[in-house]
């Protein structure tokens, strides 16, 4: 079987569901996994997810807003964590020196050739080198508040050269725009963990084993 690139939605510590998904797609030695970010917080196994991505070169991820929050906190910035981030911070902070180098290394964007991977979004009409880290980790809509769920979705307007694979904004099914596909289908909220296989254009998903977060 030819090697495949499997892009998965927000994990949020849902390690068991990731294993279920990899079993479903018959993940092989020559395949790779790219996550759209938010490896950590909210779910039960952030440590296991981080350990996997740090130890196996087949796994990579872009920076999500929750990953960024822990990175900033553990690097000594005086930021206030969200309630949903505090349990993971408390559980892992004694080992933060082990995880900080990896979190520091996460890129905000990965170019897969035919596709781009980013956590939240890209602002239409803005060159890649001019996209802000805030937009790449927080963007939902094109109104005054980038994080708003009520404004015009960025992916309805985006029409770049490459298809963007993103997460951050959970929905029951993958969000599909002109040149963008959203893969956060709310696993941590009891819904599904979804993936897109670059080479075949297939969507795959598995159900959450339980509801981990109600926020």
Model-inferred region functions:
Residues 7, 61-62, 111, 115-120, ...:
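Short hydrophobic-aromatic micro-motifs
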Residues 12-17, 41-43, 67-71, 110, ...:
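Active-site environment of divalent metal-dependent phosphoester hydrolases
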Residues 25-30, 112, 158-159:
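Glycine-rich phosphate-binding loop signature in dinucleotide/nucleotide-binding domains
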Residues 10, 38, 53, 64-65, ...:
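Divalent metal-coordination and catalytic microenvironments
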Residues 38, 113-115, 201:
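Well-ordered beta-strand scaffold positions
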Residues 46-117, 124, 130-150:
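Active-site neighborhood of divalent metal-dependent phosphoester bond hydrolases
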Residues 4, 8, 13-81:
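Core catalytic region of metal-dependent phosphoesterases/phosphodiesterases
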Residues 126, 133-215:
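Acidic, His/Gly-rich catalytic cores of divalent-metal-dependent hydrolytic chemistry
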